[in-house]
Swiss-Prot record:
It is found in: Cell membrane. Keywords: Bait region, Cell membrane, Disulfide bond, Glycoprotein, GPI-anchor, Lipoprotein, Membrane, Protease inhibitor, Serine protease inhibitor, Signal, Thioester bond. There is a cross-link at C921-Q924 (Isoglutamyl cysteine thioester (Cys-Gln)). It comes from Homo sapiens. A lipid is attached at A1420 (GPI-anchor amidated alanine). SMART domains: A2M (SM01360), A2M_N_2 (SM01359), A2M_recep (SM01361), Thiol-ester_cl (SM01419). This is CD109 antigen. SUPFAM superfamilies: Alpha-macroglobulin receptor domain (SSF49410), E set domains (SSF81296), Terpenoid cyclases/Protein prenyltransferases (SSF48239). The lineage of its organism: Eukaryota, Metazoa, Chordata, Craniata, Vertebrata. Residues 1421-1445 form a propeptide.
């Protein structure tokens, strides 16, 4: 943006020569702002002086020059009377006006003459409206929803109703989502945006495009743990080097306001840039708050010569120190940190000057404000205030010296000392006259050994040495409240004229006959008003002064919020009451935890935001050096046209004089050397609790000005604050003046601490903490509700305990803990309900724990197709069966039968989770993305897409898109782990490009992302059309072998074809010729042949039909189904075919679709439909994606709309028949029934009617860990991996176990990407960052007692990883856990091992030493399980030896 041009003499004065010749005195003074902005008026001030004709017609024109053509775009005209001072306002410039050359021409005419005429170029200001972007929070976790509002306003804060675009961008500036051409309601638009489970962490932005301008709001996405309490640290910002102590206070409170008990570790650390640092560390107890102190000897010891460079440093003025505080809560052991900086000063007191002018006006008074404070931040004592502040005032005249005279003589110097008493506040005013000959002023202040100084070296220039001074005695000037101005001068004052400028506009003008008068600010004056007062002397000189005053904004529109009560208990219903000034207002409310804004800066719309926004409209010069009357007007950004004498004088290079600069430094040494006076310091970095948003409300008040909403207080024990804004057509914006707070708290409550899951047969300690904030200690009975789903292992005969209850005394303002040893007896999620009863209060909490079956989970699915599609009534009978293996874990079996009336039905219902494997890399993430595209395509073609299903699919796609951008590299390519990989992957880049292109019709895809990926792919194509991969291909079937370049090229070609939408002239002919040539030479493996067939079919190659015929010739036929079987030997027992075989069938089906061979493809579709798992997917991600694409394309051709089938399920597993009715209305509904577990499981399925349906038998069960599962490799099962799990333990340490897992690939070459899943022993966790990433370990995921390690690949060389596990819950009788490794893209290649630790907790160990929990006899407590076993073994051995002897 170009700033306003400096106002030259030609701008300031242009009058008719004839008029000047006869004018007896000045006749006019015209002022106008130097800027123009769209949507804003240009107001011109016109004052006709006493020598002016009685009436003057003033015309103002706004001229625009574009393409060398100047036209008038706005004009206004008015008649002004002699002696008047009024304004002439041009209409506002249209909001869509472009940045052109604009000039303002002002002409004054009488009947006889042109009194004045001149023009000036105006600076075009692009800022025309205000846009506020509000989010409910400023910091989000993955998977959270971002709520935001856009508020668009004119500069007067009236609603600006317009169309705008909204863009969400991630930290890499990728476009994630957009809303285009959005219309607002009274300038307000409210939206939500869902973050994915793995978004790019960092600073995201909401960008709003309106009127060719973009407005931004950032929010941060980060992973963090919610703390239960907050810690604050209070210290002085400054500390005197003479102080004997540095004191401070630490406060630790729960978010609901109660004190924290625990331990404090405090560290005093000098922030030195040199050498080795020393520090002081102290530890002590805290109960809500604690005071601390460092004495001068301690501080000197660490600050003196700790850096080893003391001889080069001025230790009398050391650098700052950092004070670090860690508070550890005694109940849970959780720690929180906070720190602050303290700056050391040479003196005990700080003396500051402010509120003084930077220009001297001789013979008028100089005023300033002086503030005296203690360096340590404490208030001045009465004894200290008995001492005066002594101010030495030195006035000099160096006019000749500084005007360039060679004499350099000092003409005058006057010094006086003034004593001032110090009030309790430490702040006082000083005032004294400036001598008539003064041109310089220096002040030095002294107080109890401390000193400060300031100087003014500028002199206001007036030819007649006539001055006025403008002041106000009022503070906190606000809109609507009058304030007083006082004008003083060194000569008799005439009638005064004034004008007020704010935000680049002339907002008020007038005349006053008194030297003391009042003005009443309006909203247009905010946030800062530039007030000019002047009069004209008899000789025509303009005598002026300027005063800039901050004006507090006061909204005409009011909004008030009230809670129906200020305190409430969690889950209690309360009312939020809203009152506004006008009906038909839009109201936006947000209520969040009180600490949310302390953790990160708020993104709320606050008064501070509004004032800052108003400041952006202020575009004057604001030099602060108004040394003459010309500069006074310039200071307010005004253009002036006058025939009066407007003094203008330049600063004559005073500061270029080296001798002057040297003397200035010497005289002000005390003020300049002490650089710490200017140090901003560092605000304490406080870690705060970041809660969920409670209320996000948008409402139109309609005809009401009062509304009430009933809401339920969340279960959190914390404080909630609500803020709001209101907008109406007439009154514009209004804000709540202060947040309204609701304290959600109960003085007596339970906190449960238990593991996320355990395995059946294990026992765990249920930790129950009772918090008592009543005024008295209370006896509490803690009761666990009895259940047949778990046993309570309490055997004590103590009076205060029974099997399911304990009694304890809980002190006031404190907490106490009891432990109950629990043994779950049922599988699944079981509820545990705890009640605490006392004579004065009670609480009850229910929490779930997941109980898993022992052993290793297995699954089996078998499907049948019920094809009754001949448009006539039919019937059919099918049988499904399954036999559980002998080592099945009793009680783990689950049998389910499902039915649905659509080929894609199982997958549509399983969109949220199609496969059983984790998916944490760049390709696997697409399982959240690609299937949704094919489902949407399919349902759209079938005209069965519902709004709910569409929104669900789009949400998955948007989140998948967010996650996938994590894996895009700087060069535009994609790889399995993004920038962590050494290079991009052509295979994965092609896959992502294809999916993004297919998704583009449904969600917002950044076109730059597509272009960069396409360009990178084309850069990896050889001249013969072949593509190559610079890295390693993670898909095992695309790596190695003679035909891998052929397979890769066929794969990439099918992706590039979709880019023709953006680049129609894409040429893939060389690649097609390459594939045709390779096909003619012969393709031996089915996978490569299937991909080539699909690629050739996609472009209509003459070879496509021949390729498909060859592929069909190699197929297997069975029971009306067609499929392909690879030649590789069986790898493991699995009901599912190889992922490779599924992909081959899918590509074959797609080729049939492209070649319009519908009937020939039906047998393939039948086979693919039967291979799905119970979730609706297949074995892995790539086979699931390709198979669903093929099924969706093919099934869309089938006529299955008319459906009415009665399905009946009978057999031993179903004692009473299960019936499913499938018709046209519910054909997409997945109907489910649980069946009884019998051995073997067999069901008969009969179907009658017409249409199409799929029935699926799903079986889930666990198998016991066999002996072979503990060995390195099972030869019998021909496992693809060697796998060994070694447990490192210490019998004296029950809380740490190290796992050493080693694996290698037993097949030829290397595996594809491998996934190692490590299930931890119950009660253990692995610390974050405990496992380092490497060339092999690309990613580690922590997931509720399980680790997922993504391995780049595994070869014949053994790879080992050490996993340190730490106990975080007490669990005894620990069951075996398992470790597995699997080739991700060929899951049949796998190995599984189980493990356990010999060092276990016993039931006696669960309770430790907590009073009231004694499941074992005294003396047995704490014994180790293995020690007990050894003791029994030894005892029996001795017994038998005795018999033998």
């Amino acid at each position: 943006m170009q700033g306003p041009p400096l106002l030259t003499a030609a701008h300031l004065l242009c009058v008719c020569t004839a008029a000047l010749a006869v004018a007896p005195g000045p006749r006019f003074l015209v002022t106008a702002p130097g800027i123009i902005r769209p949507g804003g008026n240009v107001t011109i001030g016109v004052e006709l002086l006493e020598h002016c004709p009685s009436q003057v017609t003033v015309k103002a024109e706004l001229l625009k020059t574009a393409s060398n053509l100047t036209v008038s775009v706005l004009e206004a005209e008015g008649v002004f009377e002699k002696g008047s001072f009024k304004t002439l306002t041009l209409p506002s410039l249209p909001l869509n006006s472009a940045d052109e050359i604009y000039e303002l021409r002002v002409t004054g005419r009488t009947q006889d003459e042109i009194l004045f005429s001149n023009s000036t170029r105006l600076s075009f200001e692009t800022k025309r409206i205000s846009v506020f972007i509000q989010t409910d929070k400023a910091l989000y976790k993955p998977k959270q929803e971002v709520k935001f509002r856009i508020v668009t306003l004119f500069s007067d804060f009236k609603p600006y109703k317009t169309s705008l675009n909204i863009l969400i961008k991630d930290p890499k500036s990728n476009l994630i989502q957009q809303w285009l051409s959005q219309q607002s309601d009274l300038g307000v638009i409210s939206k939500t945006f869902q973050l994915s489970s793995h978004p790019i962490l960092g600073d995201w932005s909401i960008q709003v495009q309106v009127n060719d301008q973009t407005y931004y709001q950032s929010f941060q996405v980060s992973e963090y743990v919610l703390p239960k309490f907050e810690v604050t640290l209070q210290t002085p910002l400054y500390c005197s080097m003479n102080s004997k102590h540095l004191n401070g206070t630490i406060t630790a409170k729960y978010t609901y306001g109660k004190p924290v008990k625990g331990d404090v570790t405090l560290t005093f650390l000098p922030l030195s840039f040199w050498g080795k640092k020393k520090n002081i560390t102290k530890t002590f107890k805290i109960n809500g708050s604690a005071n601390f102190s460092f004495n001068d000897e301690e501080m000197k010891n660490v600050m003196d010569s700790s850096n080893g460079l003391s001889e080069y440093l001025d230790l009398s003025s050391p650098g700052p120190v950092e004070i670090l505080t860690t508070v550890t809560e005694s109940v849970t052991g959780i720690s929180r940190n906070v720190s602050t900086n303290v700056f050391f000063k040479q003196h005990d007191y700080i003396i500051e000057f402010f509120d003084y002018t930077t220009v001297l006006k001789p013979s008028l008074n100089f005023t300033a404000t002086v503030k005296v404070t203690r360096a340590d931040g404490n208030q001045l004592t009465l004894e200290e205030r008995r001492n005066n502040v002594v101010i030495t005032v030195t006035q000099r005249n160096y006019t000749e010296y500084w005007s360039g005279s060679n004499s350099g003589n000092q003409k005058m110097e006057a010094v006086q000392k003034i004593n001032y008493t110090v009030p309790q506040s430490g702040t006082f005013k000083i005032e004294f006259p400036i001598l008539e000959d003064s041109s310089e002023l220096q002040l030095k202040a002294y107080f109890l050994g401390s000193k400060s100084s300031m100087a003014v070296h500028s002199l206001f220039k007036s030819p007649s040495k006539t001055y006025i001074q403008l002041k106000t005695r009022d503070e906190n000037i606000k809109v609507g409240s009058p304030f007083e101005l006082v004008v003083s001068g060194n000569k008799r004052l005439k009638e005064l004229s004034y004008m007020v400028v704010s935000r680049g506009q002339l907002v008020a003008v007038g005349k006053q006959n008194s030297t003391m008068f009042s003005l009443t600010p309006e909203n247009s004056w905010t946030p800062k008003a530039c007030v000019i007062v002047y009069y004209i002397e008899d000789d025509g000189e303009i005598i002026s002064d300027v005063l800039k005053i901050p004006v507090q904004l006061v909204f005409k529109n009011k909004i008030k919020l009230y809670w129906s009560k200020v305190k409430a208990e969690p889950s209690e219903k309360v009312s939020l009451r809203i009152s506004v000034t006008q009906p038909d207002s839009i109201v936006g409310i947000v209520a969040v935890d009180k600490s949310v804004n302390l953790m990160n800066a708020s993104n709320d719309i606050t008064m501070e935001n509004v004032v800052h926004e108003l400041e952006l409209y202020n575009t004057g010069y604001y030099l602060g050096m108004f040394m003459n009357s010309f500069a006074v007007f310039q200071e307010c950004g005004l253009w002036v046209l006058t025939d009066a004498n407007l003094t203008k004088d330049y600063i004559d290079g005073v500061y270029d004089n080296a001798e002057y600069a040297e003397r200035f430094m010497e005289e002000n040494e005390g003020h300049i050397v002490d650089i710490h006076d200017f140090s901003l310091g560092s605000s304490p970095h406080v870690r705060k609790h970041f809660p969920e948003t409670w209320i996000w409300l948008d409402t139109n008040m309609g005809y009401r000005i009062y509304q009430e909403f009933e809401v339920t207080v969340p279960d959190s024990i914390t404080s909630w604050v609500a803020t709001g804004f209101v907008i109406s057509e007439d009154l514009g914006l209004g804000l709540t003046t202060t947040p309204v707070e609701l304290q959600a708290f109960q003085p007596f409550f339970i906190f449960l601490n238990l593991p996320y899951s355990v395995i059946r047969g294990e026992e765990f300690a249920l930790e129950i903490t009772i918090f008592n904030y009543l005024k008295d200690a209370t006896e509490v009975k803690v009761i666990i509700e009895k259940s047949d789903k778990f046993d309570i292992l309490m055997t004590s005969n103590e009076i205060n305990a029974t099997g399911h209850q304990q009694t304890l005394l809980v002190p006031s303002e404190d907490g106490a803990t009891v432990l109950f040893p629990i043994r779950p007896t049922h599988l699944g999620e079981i509820p545990i309900t705890v009640t605490a009863l006392s004579p004065t209060a009670s609480d009850a909490v229910t929490q779930m724990i997941l109980v898993k079956a022992e052993g290793i989970e297995k699954s089996y699915s078998q499907s049948i197709l019920l094809d009754l599609t001949d448009n006539r009534l039919q019937s059919t009978l099918k049988t499904l069966s399954f036999s559980f293996p002998p080592n099945t874990v009793t009680g783990s079996e689950r049998v389910q039968i499902t039915a649905i009336g659509d080929v894609l039905g199982p997958s549509i219902n399983g969109l949220a989770s199609l496969i059983r494997m984790p998916y944490g890399c760049g390709e696997q993430n697409m399982i959240n993305f690609a299937p949704n595209i094919y489902i949407l395509d399919y349902l759209t073609k079938k005209k069965q897409l519902t709004d709910n299903l569409k929104e669900k699919a789009l949400s998955f796609m948007r989140q998948g898109y967010q996650r996938e951008l994590l894996y895009q590299r700087e060069d535009g390519s994609f790889s399995a782990f993004g920038n962590y990989d050494p290079s991009g992957s052509t295979w994965l880049s092609a896959f992502v490009l294809r999916c993004f292109l297919e998704a583009d019709p449904y969600i917002d895809i950044d076109q730059n992302v597509l272009h960069r990926t396409y360009t990178w792919l084309k850069g990896h194509q050889k001249s013969n059309g072949e593509f190559w991969d610079p890295g390693r291909v993670i898909h095992s079937e695309l790596q190695g072998g003679n035909k891998s370049p052929v397979t890769l090229t066929a794969y990439i070609v099918t992706s590039l074809l979709g880019y023709r939408k953006y680049q129609p002239n894409i040429d893939v002919q060389e690649s097609i010729h390459f594939l045709e040539s390779e096909f003619s030479r012969g393709i031996s493996d089915n996978y490569t042949l299937a991909l080539i067939t699909y690629a050739l079919s996609s472009v209509g190659s003459p070879k496509a039909k021949e390729a498909l015929n060859m592929l069909t010739w190699r197929a297997e036929q069975e029971g009306g189904m067609q499929f392909w079987v690879s030649s590789e030997s069986k790898l493991s027992d699995s009901w599912q075919p190889r992922s490779l075989d599924i992909e081959v069938a899918a590509y074959a089906l797609l080729s049939h679709f492209l070649q319009f061979q519908t009937s020939e493809g039906i047998p393939i579709m039948r086979w693919l439909s039967r291979q799905r798992n119970s979730l609706g997917g297949f074995a892995s991600t790539q086979d699931t994606t390709v198979a669903l694409k093929a099924l969706s394309e093919f099934a869309a051709l089938m006529n299955t709309e008319r459906t009415n089938i009665q399905v009946t399920v009978t057999g031993p597993s179903s004692p009473s028949p299960v019936k499913f009715l499938i018709d046209t209305h519910n054909r997409l509904l997945l109907q489910t029934a649980e069946l009884a577990v019998v051995q073997p499981t067999a069901v008969n399925i009969s179907a009658n009617g017409f249409g199409f349906a799929i029935c699926q038998l799903n079986v889930v069960y666990n198998v016991k860990a066999s002996g072979s599962s503990r060995r390195r490799r099972s030869i019998q099962n021909q496992e693809a991996f060697d796998l060994d799990v070694a447990v490192k333990e210490n019998k004296d340490d029950l809380n740490h176990v190290d796992l050493n897992v080693c694996t290698s690939f037993s097949g030829p070459g290397r595996s594809g990407m491998a996934l190692m899943e490590v299930n931890l022993l119950s009660g253990f966790m692995v610390p974050s960052e405990a496992i380092s990433l490497s060339e092999t370990v690309k990613k580690v995921e922590y997931d509720h007692g399980k680790l997922n390690l993504y391995l780049d690949s595994v070869n014949e060389t053994q790879f080992c990883v050490n996993i340190p596990a730490v106990r975080n819950f007490k669990v005894s009788n620990t069951q075996d856990a398992s470790v597995s490794i699997v080739d991700y893209y060929e899951p049949r290649r796998q190995a599984v091992r189980s493990y356990n630790s010999e060092v276990k907790l016993s039931s006696c160990d669960l309770c430790s030493d907590v009073q009231g929990c004694r499941p074992c006899e005294d003396g047995a407590s704490g014994s180790h399980h293995h020690s007990s076993v050894i003791f029994i073994f030894c005892f029996k051995l001795l017994y038998f030896m005795e018999l033998w002897l």
